[in-house]
Amino acid sequence: MNTTEWHTTDERTADERTADERTADDYLERARQAGLVAEVRGHRYVADRYDDPFTDRRQILVEYCDPGLPADAAALGALRDQLREHHATAEAVLLRVTGGAALPAPWRPRLTYICHEPSAGTTPSHTRPAVSVRPATPDDDALVHDWLVQAFRNAYPGQEVDAHHSGIEAVVANPGRLSFIAQVAGVPIGHGTVLADERDEVTGEAFAELVDILIDDAEHRREATSALVDAAARATAGRRLCGHVVHPHEPGQARQADVVLQTLLSADWSVDHAFWESTW
C-alpha cells in the first residue's frame, strides 16, 4: 500500500483528523518521497540504516510502524526477514514501539523513553533537605562534561568511549542545554542535564529531554535525583519532560536497568515509546 492510497481511503477532511494524525501523515509523506516507506503483511513501516555513533554497529532503524505491527507476531518475523534480505550488512534492527507493549523473543528492549507526569496533590516534606540544587554556571562545565562521559560509558559497558566523543560534545554545546548541580553542604555531588528544545521526528511534538542524571553520593542519590527532576520540570514548564533508560546487553546490567525503569514507572513517569532490538 502506498501513502497516497492510504490518504484516499480516509474519508475525513484534513480539518477532521487530529493534529497527531496530520503530523503522522506529513512524516509518512516525507518518508515516502525519500523511498523509505515499505510494507509487511499489510503494515507500513519506515526504515533506514542507522550506525550506532559509539560502537559503529550497523543497524536498521524502523522509526515508524503502523500501530498493529508490534502485536502481529507473524508480521514481526516477516519484518526481520525482509530487512535482512535488503540490508545484509546490518547486524540488527531497532523497532520503535509506541507505549509499553512488550515484544516476544528474539526482540529485547534497548532504549525506553519515559515522560514525567507529576502527581497532583503531592504533600511537600517539612524536613530540611540535605540536598540543594542550583543552575549550573560556565565554571561547572568541566564537571558536567565528566559526568556525561561517565553516563555514556555506563550505557556502553565494555566499550571504549572517548571523553571527547562528538556525541558527548554535542550535548555540552547544545544551545538548549540546561544543567543543574546537586550539592550537599555546598559540595557538588551530581548533575541533571536537559535539552530543552527537542522535537520528535515522527510526531512533531516539541519536548524537553532529560539526557542524564548522575549522582556520585549514594547516601543522597534518591533525594538528589528527585530534586533534579523537579528543577528540570520547573525549568521546562509548558512542554513534556522526557527521559530514557538504556537497556544494556549484559544480563546483570539489563536486570538492573529494568529495576530502574520499574521504579520510575511506579513514581511519576510513564512509557512513551521504546526501541526494541533484534539481531539476525
Placement of each model-derived feature along the sequence:
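N-terminal charged segments
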Residues: 1-85
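Acyl-donor-binding surface of acyltransferase catalytic domains
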Residues: 8, 65-129, 243, 248-280
